[in-house]
Amino acid sequence: MPAPAVDSSRFRHRKISVKQRLRIYKSHEIKDLEQEDVSAISSQHQQRELMEIETGVEKNEEKEEHLYKILQSNQLRENKKDLFIPTPDASKTWDEFDRFYQGEFKCPTSYIQFSAQLEDCCGTLYNMDEEDEIFLADLNKSLADSVEPLTEDEFELIMANFESSIKDRQPFLSMDPESILSFADLKPTMLKNDVGDSGVKKELAKEIGMPEDEPFLTMFDNKRPLGKREKNMETLIELFGEKIHDHWKQRKISRHGCDIFPQLKSERNNDKDDNDPYVCFRRRELRQPRKTRRIDVQNSQKLRLLCQQLEYTKDLALTVAKRERAVLEVLENEKFVFQARAQLKTMKRKLGIDADNEDLYSAKKQKLVSSVRTIKQQQQLLLQKQLQIQQQQQQQLQQQQAAITSDSSVKRAKSSKSSKLHKEDSGLYADEKGSEPKKKGPKTGSNKNKEQSLSSAQEIGAQSPVANVSNVQQQQKQASSQVYVKLPNSKIPDIVLEDVGKLLHSKEKSTRKFVEDRMRKRKQEDGDIFFNLTDDPYNPVFNLSIPDNVSPQDAPFSSVAGSKFEVKTSYYSPNLQNYITGTANDIKVFNKEGEAVENNEYKKLEFFNPFDNEIHTHSREFPIAFRRRRGRFNMEYIDQRKTDHNINDMLLQFIDLDGIQKQELDNDVINVYDSKLDDLSRSYYHWKYDSNYNIYGSKFSDEPAKLNQISNDTQVVRFGTMLGSKAYEQLRDATIKYRQEQINKRKKLNSLQQQQMLQKGQQPINNAPHSQSSSPPSHQDTRKNPGSTPNQSSPPKKHVTPNAAA
């Protein structure tokens, strides 16, 4: 008998599949089924179906008693007034709140920076409490006057070293806290550990190349007076190790061998304890599979790029530190040389040595020329080299021409000149000129070229020397570019090649002309009656200003929104070009004396682009207020309003221009977050990009948390862990894939080697019968092949196993 369904809209009966397990009841197991209460069967059926419906809550949380009852009441539509989840009462106030929390938060001018990773790297993991403060005060009082007192940072460093060394030596100290090691046993381990800034500074000193004994400061070190050196771990342990060990031992025993400051508990791979309420981070076993991994790939690529950029910045900082270290060494060497020269000079005067003082004076330093050259400088150098080569070639040609003219007579020169002029006028080609060497006698091709260049130079003798140089260069280019065959002018097509810039310029020009023609036609149709605002593109809501008398609820979505908003239109104006060039007649300019100025430069419109990065100037000027009034003959005047207050004092309330100027003139290396000039430049863009609210009033960053119905902090933690887990999974899959490929390659190589060994082992076995039939085996053959016997009747060993062959 099927159980009746509670509600067809709430439950969906699924089809019975082959993979689903069904329970089979026998006849003797079900007795008096018709007499049983139908309501009991229906309630059991309802409870069974309720457990199978997804509630949107994790499976572990569904078993909670109060939540389970509420979910059942929601599905069964029962009365829910008496059901609730008990929560602690948070309505009570704390009377001593003002005693412990004092002061008011002041919003800083720059962004608030915080980095937990940086704090962990630069500071110790041990924090002092009241007991440590009392012990440190007593310890400093008991010290001698010659010994410097122990600071809080040094005390925390020693305590953290004790904690880390005891974890390495006695990891199971909580089983027997009284068996804690003595100071003599822990001392070697403490000297090896690098706790806090000391280990980081040692590695940094090795990379820069500085000696370990030489002190140096970083940006993260605390400010201390000059001459006071930082104590290393060895000196701290020698001075205060035993005294602090007794105090640390007492605190460790009181904590039963555990950490003095308890750490956050997290769930490991194998250790799973759902009953421990102090576990703050648990592993999620079930994870919804995602359909695409494109976002994961993009995030991993961004992380790789960020890692590369950080490595580049680290290398750059190290190279700068090495350079400054080299400069410091140079200065120290110069100082040492100067002091040695001063001592040498005094010694010479005492001993009365009269010698040259060349050693006392250093030679003048040569000016350092940077080897870095820009593209323009390289191009200029190439041009200079080419000009020098051309000048050398011209000088060689002139020398050759002078030698030829001295050898030849004046008559032959005149006859050759007249003959060449006659041939050029008659239009003879190169084949007719080629017959000249036969008439004049045996001459080489070089002499022929020399005579031709000489004749051409004599013909252009009346021209300027610059023209002669250009002609010689053209002849050299023609002589060097004789590789390809020249086509006659009749066969060369007259094609003018157009580049992309010209095409885009013409296209933009045609589109502008088309739009301007359409706007001019629309202007003529409308006339001077009204401006047509329907030609403008639709402006978004956040770029428009709403008047006070219009309700903002229905205005952005109404049909008459264009008439309610104050929109900056872009309608057509026929006199706009005159306003831009300053040739408009309806604009007049007057100077301070009231005289009209006819210069068109003062009539031009000034264009301002608020999104241009280069137009912002940081100055002490204050915005000036103007007013418009009409005078006689309906003339329109613009006056400047007078301000009673000092505009510079009012501006300095918001911007510290003196501090910015002082910081820039100091010319020190400034962190980008501490730069006041950068803070001022960011303030210009605060109104554009730093809006935390949308048109509905809620923060943009809270929208994903609202969609998931969780808090914003939980959403941030979930998103960060998701990125980390996805990147780790991708890296793990890549390593597994790479290892599988290497294993497959290794298997293929092994199989190929085994096949080659099998083939080598089968070759002597196949050749054995032929050698036996041709000639009996000798004594030497038996020595070489001990496996073969002289008995021919014995069958050869054809079956060779791979192991034997190997």
Swiss-Prot record:
* Main localization of the protein described in the UniProt heading: nucleus
- Name where it's found: Nucleus
Q: Which GO terms describe its biological process?
A: DNA repair; regulation of transcription by RNA polymerase II
* Pfam families listed in its UniProt record: EPL1
Residue intervals passing through the bilayer: none
Q: Where is the composition biased (Polar residues)?
A: 785-795
Which UniProt keyword terms apply here?
Cell cycle, DNA damage, DNA repair, Nucleus, Transcription, Transcription regulation
Segments carrying the region annotation (Disordered) are 403-461, 751-806
Has the keyword rRNA processing been applied to this entry?
A: no
| Bias (Low complexity) ranges | 751-779
Gene Ontology CC annotations of this record: NuA4 histone acetyltransferase complex; nucleus
Q: Where is the composition biased (Basic residues)?
A: 411-420
Q: Which residues form a coiled coil?
A: none
- Compositional bias (Basic and acidic residues): 421-439
Self-association or partners: how does it assemble? Component of the NuA4 histone acetyltransferase complex.
Q: What does this protein do?
A: Component of the NuA4 histone acetyltransferase complex which is involved in transcriptional activation of selected genes principally by acetylation of nucleosomal histone H4 and H2A. The NuA4 complex is also involved in DNA repair. Involved in gene silencing by neighboring heterochromatin, blockage of the silencing spreading along the chromosome, and required for cell cycle progression through G2/M.
Q: Which family does it belong to?
A: Belongs to the enhancer of polycomb family.
Kindly provide the name given to this protein in its UniProt entry: Enhancer of polycomb-like protein 1
Give the species.
Kluyveromyces lactis (strain ATCC 8585 / CBS 2359 / DSM 70799 / NBRC 1267 / NRRL Y-1140 / WM37) (Yeast)
Question: Lineage in the entry?
Answer: Eukaryota, Fungi, Dikarya, Ascomycota, Saccharomycotina
